[in-house]
Amino acid sequence: MPSPIALLTAATERIERVDAEALLLHALDCDRAWLFTHGDIPLAAAATESFQALVEQRARGIPVAYLIGRRGFWTLDVMVSSATLIPRAETETLVEQALQRLDHASERRVADLGTGSGAIALAIACERPQAQVLATDNSAAALDIAARNASAHGLNHVVFREGDWYEALLGERFDLIVSNPPYIAVTDPHLTQGDLRFEPPSALISGGDGLDALRILTAGAPAYLRPGGWLVMEHGWDQGAAMRTLLHTAGLVAVATVQDLEARDRVTVGRCPGF
């Protein structure tokens, strides 16, 4: 029977080492410390076959997050499935900007539109436990994953509703509306590359220029924000200028675009006047 290190070495001929390690840890249900202190022991046939099957799937392009069923985001280990977008590091910029505009007052109300796995809503709820957080999505399958994530992290006060964008808010108003909506143009060649090939198109594609969902969300925001409330939106690296125009057109003030850690436009914010 091969050892963990032998399996890992063989796998790196087909896939990236970081991916191979993640898959091996998953197949063995162990941590890195165990792996590298027991790296030379023979493995059972079942564990070997499980790992090799995962490597085969990864070699075909299936994202590691879908193969192991989870992804780290913020301080959370988030369950994901093919019904949800895979949380990405750049989206932590969105969470940071939301938290900067959300104090610890218990009456603060937050809506995360298009929550997917719930990563954004749960990160905010974790950092602002007094806030009333509502997370919405038009996918029942995604909401099921999000609710399971909330339960796993003891964030059972987060409320989930099914609905398309603002229809799920039922006319309520919020101190902060946050969203990472689809913002990729239907003709974007990146859709045929990498992990994007396997993620739900409805969570990625938004019309001919990628702005359809962003237009809906910015135009509708004033009707659902309290005076002084903030809209915080993630978007593509080349959409910052368009987003600022959309927020200004919607009547929001203090409009600004924030860059991610790679110095790319990633989040645009605006405040509802009247406060």
Swiss-Prot record:
Broad enzyme group: transferase
Binding site for S-adenosyl-L-methionine: 114-118, 137, 165, 180
EC code(s) of this entry: 2.1.1.297
Binding-site list for substrate: 180-183
Record's keyword terms, sorted: Methyltransferase, S-adenosyl-L-methionine, Transferase
Keyword Iron listed: no
CDD domains: AdoMet_MTases
GO biological process, one term: methylation
Catalytic activities: L-glutaminyl-[peptide chain release factor] + S-adenosyl-L-methionine = N(5)-methyl-L-glutaminyl-[peptide chain release factor] + S-adenosyl-L-homocysteine + H(+)
Gene3D superfamilies: DNA helicase RuvA subunit, C-terminal domain, Vaccinia Virus protein VP39
Gene Ontology terms, MF aspect: nucleic acid binding; protein-(glutamine-N5) methyltransferase activity; protein-glutamine N-methyltransferase activity
Superkingdom field: Bacteria
Physiological role: Methylates the class 1 translation termination release factors RF1/PrfA and RF2/PrfB on the glutamine residue of the universally conserved GGQ motif.
Family: Belongs to the protein N5-glutamine methyltransferase family. PrmC subfamily.
Protein name per the record: Release factor glutamine methyltransferase
Organism of provenance: Xylella fastidiosa (strain 9a5c)
